[in-house]
A protein has these predicted regions:
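Bacterial/eukaryotic Sec-type N-terminal signal peptides
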Residues: 1-3
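Conserved ASCE/P-loop NTPase catalytic core
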Residues: 40-651
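Long, basic/Gly/Ser/Thr-rich N-terminal segments
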Residues: 5-55
Length: 651
């Protein structure tokens, strides 16, 4: 290795070490330990409101601190930074989860219900819970997220539980906050045995939420129902300590290892909750409603925690079939977490998943490879609409916030509401990534084209033994739709732009000409020729030749033109230039117009069996431009050019 390489390696290592040091400084929280008297004197007065938060309020404050885009009134958030780099296209579900915590933190009845995330596999439920847990861990290391507990308490309870009920009214008058909760049996015994009832001497310390350390985060995964033991949730007698304390009813002889105790002051994750025994469910729902659990030999144990549960559709439908479960459903807040219905967001999911895989990092993907896979995935998740003229391809574009003729963006929410089950079934991201992985292992070129992706998906569908023949045929038909309605347009546009280097400027000039002609037509005035100075009427033939490229009818041309002028006026008032990106459908029309004008040139250059030297140079220049400007490599650029040549020969 060269000295330069060694130096660069050393510099990157030094930078990494510096980033670690900076991280520890940023996240190093001030540890604190003292008596309850010192806590009341030194710590509590600093921020009484924050230090008396319940678990729902704590999670809500963490979410707000993580950062969000404001969309209106205070605390009305749309997209939290906590989820920004991991979850894509499920903003509605994230909004409902945040609404749950906002309402619960305000003291509404919502806080007395269990939060259940319901959705298909690989839809983001587990990731959402993981991110919430990681957010809580980090938040607890900040001064804003400081948590204090009775030292040695098995449930990390608030030190304020030490204050007797007879004095809590005075506490409320002094500090302006209520104390909720009772001292746990373990600390009650310690108070008498170790401190002779003098609660002011009880030790208190700052705690930090940690899933690995079982502090503030508990997790329960279902076992075989025949062997599942409720002790996994609430603990059991520790026989090794019974001989020491002489009584199974002594709290010190109890094993406080249950998941509900680990989750105290934070969150309890219940994985596949509907698979657990009904007695487990009743215990959890009582805990959610009353903040108490009852175990043998002890009085009610107060626990302040938020239960985050998730399950899949199959288990949920099975659960619904049992009539005795209706009462349980009333005590849950169910948030649906569907697959995303935007192919652009779906492609972002694939980008995230493949970035962690070494064999993907070593393979070039053409610029549309992930997009064609994403469009296919979305098609499998959609339901046919009863609206006339709204096919699945148009739905795909609508849900990706693209313009579709005859449907305004304001109607999208209504269309979504007509088929609420969309996104709850269909292809999972995992299915697509597995298909891409197989395609990459077969590829010798270390390059994957969009057509190779479609073939890989075709193989995955045909070889899937779980799928019924009818579904296989439907999904194979979707691959044809992806190619015809989406990929063909994208790849032709790339080749066209690469062939005509001045395309962007020509398109902008054509846009300005269209706008001039439309404004003159709407104003009923003639246009002055800039060269001859003569006047002429607006060029209706030119206007229609552009509009027909996107199927604007004769009856619909006036409203389309008025819409274009209206958008141009908005851009003018905002001090911005009306460009191709200002109107997606007009952009498409102008591209198609230019493409038609140059079709013969393109066909001549790309389809010659024995190209002359000039044609070879043009082909080489097109391929080079596709590599340098449009995200292709040599292999995929050549394949794309050959594919477009085939398309042109068929037209």
């Amino acid at each position: 290795m060269s000295k330069a390489g060694v130096t660069e390696g050393n510099e990157s290592q030094i930078k990494f070490l510096e980033s670690l040091t900076a991280f520890t400084k940023e996240h190093r929280a001030r540890h604190w330990e003292g008596t309850f008297a010192a806590f009341l004197e030194d710590v509590l007065p600093r921020d009484t409101q924050r230090l008396t938060r319940n678990s729902h309020q704590y999670v809500w404050d963490m979410l707000r601190r993580s950062g969000a885009k404001e969309v209106g009134a205070q605390d009305q958030m749309s997209s939290y930074q906590l989820f920004a780099d991991e979850l894509f296209g499920i903003d509605d579900a994230l909004e409902r989860v945040s609404d749950y915590f906002k309402a619960a933190s305000a003291g509404s009845e919502v806080g007395r219900r269990l939060l259940l995330l319901l959705g298909p596999p690989s839809g983001g439920k587990s990731t959402m819970v993981i991110l919430l847990k990681r957010g809580l861990e980090e938040y607890s290391h900040t001064e804003e997220g400081a948590l204090y507990a009775i030292k040695g308490c098995p449930i990390k309870e608030s030190p304020l539980h030490l204050i007797p009920h007879t004095l809590r009214g005075t506490f409320r008058e002094t500090y302006g906050v209520e104390i909720s909760g009772e001292l746990c049996p373990y600390c009650r015994v310690r108070l008498e045995q170790e401190f002779a009832g003098d609660f002011m001497k009880f030790p208190v310390h700052r705690i930090f939420i940690s899933e690995a350390g079982r502090e503030g985060i508990g997790t329960y995964a279902p076992h075989d129902p025949a062997t599942a033991d409720i002790a996994d949730l609430v603990g059991s007698v520790d026989l090794s300590k019974v001989s020491k304390y002489g009584d199974e009813g002594d709290p010190r002889a109890w094993s406080w290892s249950g998941a509900v105790y680990a989750a105290s002051r934070g969150v309890l994750e219940m994985i596949e909750i509907l698979k657990v025994k009904r007695e487990f469910l009743y215990l959890l729902l009582t805990l959610t409603q009353e903040k108490n659990v009852k175990v043998s030999r002890f009085p009610l144990i107060y626990l302040d925690e938020t239960i985050l549960a998730h399950t899949n559709l199959a288990e949920f439908h099975k659960f619904l079939q049992e009539k005795e479960n209706e009462a349980l459903l009333d005590r849950m807040v169910i948030v649906r977490v569907p697959y995303t219905l935007s192919y652009k967001e779906e492609a972002r999911i694939y980008t995230k998943l493949i970035s962690a895989a070494p064999h993907f990092r070593e393979t070039h993907l053409d610029p549309h490879a992930l997009r064609v896979a994403a469009v296919f995935a979305i098609l499998t998740r959609l339901h046919k609409s009863e609206r006339e003229g709204l096919d699945l391809s148009k739905k795909v574009r609508l849900y990706a916030h693209e313009e579709v003729e005859g449907i305004s963006s304001s109607e999208v929410d209504r269309i979504r509401a007509e088929t609420p089950e969309e996104g709850m079934s269909g292809v999972s991201p995992r299915f697509v990534i597995n298909a891409l992985s197989k395609a990459i292992t077969r590829s010798e070129a270390r390059s994957l084209t969009s057509m190779e992706v479609l073939l890989a998906l075709k193989d995955a569908i045909e070889s899937d033994a779980r799928m019924e023949a009818k579904q296989k045929r439907q999904w194979l038909d979707f691959l044809v739709v992806v190619r015809k309605d989406f990929y063909n347009h994208w790849v032709k546009e790339d080749v066209h732009k690469a062939l005509f280097a001045s395309f962007e400027q020509e398109a902008q000039t054509l846009l300005e000409k269209y706008l001039d002609e439309v404004e003159a037509m709407l104003d009923h005035r003639e246009i002055v020729d800039p060269i001859t100075g003569e006047t002429r009427p607006p060029d209706e033939r030119f206007l229609r030749s552009v509009e027909e490229k996107i199927h604007i009818s004769e009856s619909g041309k006036l409203s389309f033109r008025q819409e274009v002028v209206r958008k141009a006026m908005v851009a003018y008032k905002q001090g911005t230039k009306f460009s191709l990106d200002s109107h997606a459908r007009l952009h498409e029309a102008i591209e198609q117009y230019l493409f038609e004008e140059r079709r013969d040139v393109l066909r001549l250059v790309t389809s010659s069996k024995r190209p002359d030297e000039e044609a070879k140079q043009k082909i080489s220049a097109v391929q080079r431009r596709m590599v340098e400007e449009y995200g292709y490599d040599e292999h995929s650029a050549k394949e794309a050019l050959n594919y477009v040549t085939t398309l042109l020969s068929q037209e």
